[in-house]
Amino acid sequence: VYAELLDFSVKSSSVGDMPDLPLKVMMNVGNPDRAFDFACLPNEGVGLARLEFIINRMIGVHPRALLEFDDQEPGLQNEIRELMKGYDSPREFYVGRLTEGIATLGAAFYPKRVIVRLSDFKSNEYANLVGGERYEPEEENPMLGFRGAGRYVSESFRDCFALECEAMKRVRNDMGLTNVEVMVPFVRTVAQAKAVVEELERQGLKRGENGLKIIMMCE
């Protein structure tokens, strides 16, 4: 570092005299790369962090294509290998990258609440991920189709959902970022809500344990 080699300017704003608000303003943060920047702004934590952004930006591969990596055709395998360089396995690539993204958000705003919404890709969006076309149905209206909570408890997606749960456990239990909370999207019925809570518990994310809160979007 060479002192005074380049000119630069610093802009600062004082927020010390701002009045207290009668409510808590939480942020929507999607990009972990900006988390520490946004954490410097006045805030009460993160009200919504979408897992889809992390999957799209940091992974880019359909989870089923990774779980069934050995069954993919050679060209697709090579494409996936390029994306997962530095990771021991396709599974670890998915879980590790999710963990990195979630933990970055949790650490940036710690100890404030960070509500992370589990994946809510629509079928056409999952199909756009590398290897995704093979595993997704063609739906008339994906907005109301196979998405959110309904995926988590389906036999065709349950083990993919387990990867998200593993990442969340690493963030909360191994890294100690217990300020990270779970949001379940697109819950359609009470029975579905109950089934997802039970599935989360089977995956090691029990409501109330280690202070875990589970929030749901009922749509």
Predicted features and spans:
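Conformationally flexible catalytic loops at phosphate/diphosphate-handling active centers
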Residues: 1
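Beta-strand/loop-dominated core regions that host nucleotide or nucleotide-derived cofactor-binding catalytic loops
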Residues: 5
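Small/polar beta-strand repeat architecture
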Residues: 8-12
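Conserved alpha/beta-domain cores
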Residues: 13-219
